[in-house]
Amino acid sequence: FYPTILELTGATLKPYQHKDGVSLVPLLKGNRVFDRGAIYFHYPHYVGKGDSPAGAIRKGDYKLIWFYEDDHIELYNLKMDISEKENLAETQKERALSLQKELQEWLCSCAAKMPVYNPDYKEIKY
């Protein structure tokens, strides 16, 4: 939202502060066409029980999620399956691998930090 706020307030855009952000002002002005290509997501953290580090790419109707810990991927057609119940990674392998490659290239291009194993970690039982 940062580029949108900057544009609405007349402030100078600062791309070095919002590398992959874009202004939504054209949408607010009624322009229904908004093609931003792919949207990328990288979250290399453990947050709560059951959560694991992952990255994702949303391109067109498809969303691919790559779980770093066990290296598995999930692919969803969000137009047909908004609740992400039918994993298409096995039935659309070529699309899944292509999106995973694109996500990997983006991660490399922005020097994304990946999770590393901490041998000193000790779980605390409450």
Task: Name the predicted role of every residue range.
Residues 81:
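Intrinsically disordered, low-complexity polar regions and short flexible loop motifs
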